[in-house]
């Protein structure tokens, strides 16, 4: 059995003179969840539409389970999509919404009723079949949309920013539910989001896209710290990028020096480099060396941490500080870097 289940080969998509997907290759293994992550306009939604058959590639091929589906319609690809907007029918009951696709396939009433019951149980909505859309919450509506896709037992499940309309607590619980169901059912899945936390929470692999190409692939969160791309720094967590120097495992930014024990992981030669610092990698103290002194410009309490902007070494630095580790009345402090959350880049 071939484990390369969903394959995009040399895919290019142009609209007029504008190329939005440029010679893209992508392989999704059987039974895995892969997320396309990137800012608006990076091409991730176009890839989704190409896989689903909603758009045709300008060139290249798409294979599902070894079959060339490049020219196949969406009806012939055995794919289901969970949309951001849920797209539920308000005049139908929950059971009829979930069973709509089965009815279109001509599945008998008895089998349809049983499969709808099983699908609703999967998403913890047993007993909801007779309710209507306006009688359930947003999180429950999203689970109905998920059940409607799962009931068809598709070869490929596509999820298009499915959690963006939910509040923070619902997003957390729903991404856990989506991941649990995907692993339990073994459905090959393609997930699209611009939220990096969401991406890593649900995925076997994360694909970062920018300007129609794959910039990087990662299976672990270390990706965010160790191999983040300079061109995506603002999107990927507001890291601060500083001019620095590397010398045998010691990093210098101006007069501030600190050891970086995993410096060899970054494939950056000794000498001038770029040093990326994540907001959570910075600790503020009341004392320190002159080279670490910073001026507090602003501090906003975000509910579970302080988001601080400090001027240090001539640059505004974004810092996330725990409530018990920061004095909101402070006007100055001293910066300390922790190794986890520091990454190095070659100067272009």
Swiss-Prot record:
It is a peripheral membrane protein. GO terms for cellular component: ATP-binding cassette (ABC) transporter complex. InterPro entries: AAA+_ATPase (IPR003593), ABC_SmlMolc_Importer (IPR050093), ABC_transporter-like_ATP-bd (IPR003439), ABC_transporter-like_CS (IPR017871), ABC_transpr_FbpC (IPR015853), Mo/tungstate-bd_C_term_dom (IPR008995), P-loop_NTPase (IPR027417), Transp-assoc_OB_typ2 (IPR013611). Keywords: ATP-binding, Cell inner membrane, Cell membrane, Ion transport, Iron, Iron transport, Membrane, Nucleotide-binding, Translocase, Transport. Its main location: membrane. Its EC number is 7.2.2.7. The keyword NAD does not apply. Belongs to the ABC transporter superfamily. Fe(3+) ion importer (TC 3.A.1.10) family. The complex is composed of two ATP-binding proteins (FbpC), two transmembrane proteins (FbpB) and a solute-binding protein (FbpA). This is Fe(3+) ions import ATP-binding protein FbpC. It comes from Actinobacillus pleuropneumoniae. The gene is fbpC.
């Amino acid at each position: 059995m071939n484990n390369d289940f969903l394959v995009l080969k040399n895919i290019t998509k142009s609209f007029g003179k504008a190329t939005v997907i440029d010679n893209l290759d992508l392989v999704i293994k059987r039974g895995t969840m892969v997320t396309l992550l990137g800012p608006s306009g990076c091409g991730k939604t176009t890839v989704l539409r190409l896989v689903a058959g909603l758009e045709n590639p300008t060139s290249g091929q798409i294979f599902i389970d070894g079959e060339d589906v490049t020219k196949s319609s969406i009806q012939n690809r055995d794919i289901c999509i969970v949309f951001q907007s849920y797209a539920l029918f308000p005049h139908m009951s929950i059971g009829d919404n979930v069973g709509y696709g089965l009815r279109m396939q001509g599945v008998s009433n008895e089998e349809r009723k049983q499969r709808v019951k099983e699908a609703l149980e999967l998403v913890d909505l047993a007993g909801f079949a007779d309710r209507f859309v306006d009688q359930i919450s947003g999180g429950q509506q999203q689970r109905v949309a998920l059940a409607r896709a799962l009931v068809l037992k598709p070869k490929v499940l596509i999820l298009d920013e499915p959690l963006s309309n939910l509040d923070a607590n619902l997003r957390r619980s729903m991404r856990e539910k989506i991941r649990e169901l995907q692993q339990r059912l073994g459905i090959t899945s393609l997930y699209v989001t611009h939220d990096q936390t969401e991406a890593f929470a649900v995925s076997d692999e994360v694909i970062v896209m920018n300007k129609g190409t794959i910039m990087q692939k990662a299976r672990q969160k270390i990706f965010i710290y160790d191999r983040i791309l300079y061109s995506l720094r603002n999107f990927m967590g507001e890291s601060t990028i500083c001019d620095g120097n590397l010398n045998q495992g010691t990093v210098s930014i101006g007069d501030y020096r600190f050891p970086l024990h995993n410096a060899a992981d970054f494939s950056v030669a000794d000498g001038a480099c770029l040093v990326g610092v994540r907001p959570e990698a910075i600790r503020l103290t009341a004392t320190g060396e002159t080279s670490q002194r910073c001026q507090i410009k602003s501090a906003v309490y975000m509910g579970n941490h302080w988001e601080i902007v400090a001027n240090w070494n001539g640059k505004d630095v974004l810092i996330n500080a725990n409530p018990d580790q920061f004095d909101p009345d402070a006007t100055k402090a001293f910066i300390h870097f922790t190794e986890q959350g520091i990454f190095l880049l070659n100067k272009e």
